[in-house]
Amino acid sequence: CRATPQLIPTHPAQHILTMTDKLWCAQHLQQHHIATPQTDDAPQSVEALRAQLHKQRRYAVFVKPRWGSSAAGVMAYRFRPNEEQLITTARLVDGQLVNEKRLHVYRDSASISVLLQTILSDGAVVQRWIPKAATSGGPFDVRVLMIAGQLAQRVARVGNGAITNLHIDAKRMSAEEALDSVGPHVADRVYFVCQQVADSFPGQLVLGIDVMVDAAGRPFVIECNAWGDYLPKLLHHGQDSYDSQVHALFGTAA
């Protein structure tokens, strides 16, 4: 009879489901007492969202597709009764929402309403907007890879606004350099939190964690990615992220 090849599970299905659902992921982090911005299921209409924010006196939030990645459809929304601002990579083209590799800033209520409604209708979350600490180049967050539960590649993503993904032209910076610019031991606090996250997803080979710190150096986990390992030319102990995964599985580099 033919021998059955041994399968090595690297990403438990339930972990993938949890991390690809922003609401479930936030609830998972909260259940494990890991600091994360307050994240709630969003109303399905712009009017209900504005009423909710006004009632709660929340004037700066992120509205994000509940299922999505790469900042697609993410909207940084400032709301006051007589003034609004929306920052996003999305724009409307012939009635269709198009994601672009740059940020757009909207200030007219009509455009903001259409953009928000498009995202809300498909299912979204509302996340508290905590201002990110800034280094000399601007506000930043950090992508941290945990491979087989261990700290691996990491990089600061320095932008010129609220959304700092690398593919929309945020600049790379050493994570330690960026975190040290905020204050002493900030990097240690960030990596401690990342270890907590990794421990909460046992059996996960690769975990990409997006972490921000506020001006006081307090870390908050923004999102978790079931992969998040596309970080070209970023090395840890001389290995890129794919070498590190092969080493973790087989004890040798690719």
What residues fall within each predicted segment?
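Conserved N-proximal alpha/beta basic substrate-recognition cap immediately N-terminal to
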Residues: 1-52
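Short secondary-structure junctions
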Residues: 33-35, 57-59, 200-205
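Coil-to-beta-strand transition motifs
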Residues: 34, 69, 137, 148-152, ...
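Short, flexible loop/turn elements at secondary-structure junctions
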Residues: 43, 67, 130, 148, ...
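Phosphate-binding site of ATP-dependent enzymes
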Residues: 56-166
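Active-site proximal loops enriched in glycine and acidic residues that flank catalytic Cys/His/Asp
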Residues: 128, 155-158, 209-211, 223-226
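Short acidic loop-to-beta-strand element that houses the catalytic metal-binding Asp/Glu
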Residues: 143-144, 210-212
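C-terminal active-site "lid" helix and adjoining low-complexity regulatory extension at the edge
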Residues: 167-206, 213-254
